[in-house]
Amino acid sequence: MIGIDLVDLNVAAVESNPFRKGYLDKVFSAEEQTLITNASKPHTMVWLLWSMKEAVYKIFSNEMNIRVFAPIDIQCSITDLSTESVKGNVCAYNEYYCTQTTISSSYMYSLAAKEKTELQYIKVKLYPYPSTFDYHATAPQSISHHGDYLALAY
């Protein structure tokens, strides 16, 4: 099973203020907040960690049939960081997952899987959103949309 989460960075910059009082404490662990504080682009780091958590949640919620999203209970760590790609590990309720995030100037998307080797086989297709075709007919394993983008993972 795989998960994907996409963030339209332009929309996120306009519609959300993750630095408002109390938000970081509700969503991110102390270690994650340190990553945010020390990042050269704190806003991007917030959405990176959020995207990792969401991608894993999509797997976890389907595997465990649990529909409660408590992002503070999903812990992220980064194992490899560059300007365009990030690899990480995520622990959700004592279940471990691997993530890989692709970052562009206008969006980012995170892929999640139980095994690191699974990530290399995931195919991602990006489309404008809202989409004019029936993407459900293509049978994606995971779907994410935000702002101007739709991401399908196969």
Language-model features: locations:
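Core catalytic alpha/beta fold that binds nucleotide/phospho-ligands
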Residues: 1-154
